[in-house]
Amino acid sequence: MKTLGEFIVEKQHEFSHATGELTALLSAIKLGAKIIHRDINKAGLVDILGASGVENVQGETQQKLDLFANEKLKAALKARDIVAGIASEEEDEIVVFEGCEHAKYVVLMDPLDGSSNIDVNVSVGTIFSIYRRVTPVGTPVTMEDFLQPGSQQVAAGYVVYGSSTMLVYTTGCGVHAFTYDPSLGVFCLCQERMRFPQSGNTYSINEGNYIKFPMGVKKYIKYCQEEDKATQRPYTSRYIGSLVADFHRNLLKGGIYLYPSTASHPEGKLRLLYECNPMAFLAEQAGGKASDGKQRILDIKPDSLHQRRPFFVGTEQMVNDVERFIREFPDA
């Protein structure tokens, strides 16, 4: 049995940014995940369910667990003095850690993806993304350090809190998964160098918004539903409503996750920096693909901290197919 800590140290030689700082940073995220795991498991017993009554910068009501997870991860990262600053879906602006100007890295995170599912005991997750800062070490970080294209990520990953808690991450040398053993308090290696299956037969989308989708996406959904033995259609529809949970299932089984633009959200709804970029990095490292329907997600240069984007991620051929439909059936 190999623990996450042992694995990270063992694999340091495989990536160019191997330093003790990055290892300690991943360890801090691991600690934050353990704390969130502990409290999610007793969510119905303590007063951390439901809405907080506070709205974030996007005008969305924050759940109590959103704020709890954000504070716990922020504290875990700040305590190690190895992160110069963070950006979070739950914070209006970047958070600069005073006294950490010497640190090389910044972290972007969605502390609790799918938090509205907690009340009904459905899987949720944490998403994180790590970049090497571009401003000089020794100075406070600025917005420039956070508005980097996803191709510049040093590491990314997610934690899925479900029937078991799993941490999945990449440093650009494959995707590896670890299952949390609460009796020992450690994450243990369960899958190394994960890969998307070459073909998939599952599509994950909120079809309740069908009427609002672009024509190309509507045509793709109909394609998924048509019978064709050569392509193993019709495909199966599976949608949990938590990006982490839907992505994790499709990574294991083969499939595509779709969150297109809609009439009410013409720029898409998922955040480029906190959701799309880290999941795209993981997807590509696992042999999959991620796109906004027209271009590679990791090539997009962000222009704002909470920028949104349409998102299609999963088995490469399935993402290619939806891109083809979007090209062939443009909206007027």
UniProtKB/Swiss-Prot annotation:
Note the InterPro entries from the entry: FBPase_C_dom, FBPase_class-1, FBPase_N, FBPtase, Fructose_bisphosphatase_AS
GO CC, one annotated term:
cytosol
* Cofactor notes: Binds 2 magnesium ions per subunit.
Instruction: Give compartment(s).
Output: Cytoplasm
Identify the enzyme class: hydrolase
Q: Which GO terms describe its molecular function?
A: fructose 1,6-bisphosphate 1-phosphatase activity; magnesium ion binding
The prosthetic group or cofactor this protein requires is: Mg(2+)
The residues that hold Mg(2+) 1 are: 89, 110, 112
| EC number(s) given by UniProt | 3.1.3.11
- Catalytic reaction list: beta-D-fructose 1,6-bisphosphate + H2O = beta-D-fructose 6-phosphate + phosphate
What broad class describes the main subcellular location of this protein?
cytoplasm
Recorded hits in Pfam families, A to Z, give: FBPase, FBPase_C
Biological processes, Gene Ontology terms: fructose 1,6-bisphosphate metabolic process; fructose 6-phosphate metabolic process; fructose metabolic process; gluconeogenesis; sucrose biosynthetic process
Keywords from the UniProt entry? Carbohydrate metabolism, Cytoplasm, Hydrolase, Magnesium, Metal-binding
Q: Keyword Calcium, does the record have it?
A: no
Pathway as given in its UniProt record: Carbohydrate biosynthesis; gluconeogenesis
Ligand binding (substrate): 113-116, 206, 239, 257-259, 269
Q: Which residues bind Mg(2+) 2?
A: 110, 113, 275
Query: Is this entry keyworded Nuclease?
Result: no
Query: How does this chain assemble?
Result: Homotetramer.
The UniProt entry's sequence similarity note says: Belongs to the FBPase class 1 family.
Alphabetical list of NCBIfam families matching this protein: PRK09293.1-1 (NF006778), PRK09293.1-3 (NF006779)
Q: How is this protein named in the record?
A: Fructose-1,6-bisphosphatase class 1
Q: Which organism is it from?
A: Cronobacter sakazakii (strain ATCC BAA-894) (Enterobacter sakazakii)
